[in-house]
Amino acid sequence: MFEFHADDYGLFPEQSRRILDCIENGVINGVSIMPNSPYLKECMEFLSGKDVKLTVHLNLVEGAPLTAGACEHISGDGAFNISFGKLLIVSYIPFLRKKYYEEIKRELEEQIKAVAPYFKDGYRLDSHVHYHMLPVVFDALADVIRENGIKVTYIRVPSEDLKLYKGIKLRPINRVKVMVLNTLARRNRRKYKELFDKFENKKFSGVACSGEMNYENVKTLISRIDASENFEILFHPGAVLEDEDIARLTSKDDMAFLTSENRHTEEMATKMLKDNKDVEI
């Protein structure tokens, strides 16, 4: 069973309408919602009556923290400003780790509380740029879940088998990202085995082909997956095109990524998959 998933829903209204279009006219049947977005409530109204799986897109990258004023290490000038690499290093330096851990824990707790009205039967969790895989972040998240008795049914584990992409041209940086995330996934699964045993188990695709999730590549990928497997395939079809919204983006990486022509390519891939009856989904 495939979950065709779109991240970043709720970031901006028009951007979210583009994802909505991929639900109505494409194969998207799951979205991750941005818990710290000031536009989330408005964007959630667009989904009224839609049969779509919701996931919390825990966010330590884009926009302002919900714990503004209490997170000096992970934000500055009113917005998040902590890189993946820095948090990876911090994860293994004890005297720094504690400071970041406490701030991250408070922020994750507030983000989960902020979206409580949309999750009546338990939470599904992932994160922007997969930050939740970082040791200090995952440890904080696990403690938030445990200490608050939060019912969680799924946490995305962005672990991929590169053999699945044989013959598909992958960007070298994506290969590196996959190796890093696979290593972090093994660490988290090993440390929190009892926690993961309670979750829905899904295989994942979306980092190796990031920037290359075009129709032909996705069609090839689907043909290699056993239809009986529980599989999440990740897209980012939510382009940010409005000048006023582009100006509101706080992450330079997000600005480049969300304004890229690749967002339209992925949008079209979701629609072509729905239209092509030769592709078994």
Task: Name the predicted role of every residue range.
Residues 127-129:
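Active-site histidine-anchored catalytic micro-motif
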